[in-house]
Amino acid sequence: MVSPDAVRTVLGICGNVISFFLFLSPLPTFIKICKKKSVEQYSPMPYLATLMNCLVWTLYGMPMVHPNSLLVITINGIGIVIEVVYIILFLVYCNGKKERVKVVMVVLAEVVFVACLTLLVLTLAHTYTLRSTIVGSVCLVFNIMMYASPLTVMKLVIKTKSVEYMPFTLSFVSLANGIIWTAYACINFDPFIVIPNSLGTLSALVQLVLYATFYKSTQIQIAERKAQIHLSEVVVKGGSLSNKTTNDGDATSPVSETMAPPHKK
């Protein structure tokens, strides 16, 4: 018979693998952004929230906070690098200085917060249990924020009736990630993991429901937009051809005058 600890270990490894693919899931979105050289209506909030989540979980996994948590440090350290790359690409292709300043200020605030939290925990909390509880509680809050961050995107989907700016891959991998980590934490109950990942599972389910609901209307909108672009090109080309024909006619047509015959008495 397989022991619960063995199952939990396997789920933990699977969770790390899925988390890695979760970090990579926005890659098609950023490839699209790079090709168009514009972030269009994509929001930076999911990536900023994920960066914050990775920062606090990396702190949680440190030996002086929660010993024997190498997997936690590894996967969240990788997550930090990936999210920083995404945010840099967003800064490069976002529209307007105001948006760039806003994103930079949020990143700076996150770094300052984690630095202050690290200093306070290491100086005021003198046991692993207390440090783990404090940092774990903070992780719980920011994990919930990470899963709640797509709410802004979901609002846009409902408003525009288009899922064009809500990547399916990200929603699907988020669902798988939430299910795996919820199951992992239920074997040896850990509220710091169960609560945020249960909410993450629910959030991902809602996103997939919205995707199924508005997928057809999205395709219609995309088709109409392409048709309008094609029509505009035809009109522009037709207008250019007409002007060319008119100009050619003016240049080659002789100017004739009708002279009245002399009047005879």
What are these regions (language model features)?
Residues 1-265:
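Alpha-helical membrane-protein topology signature
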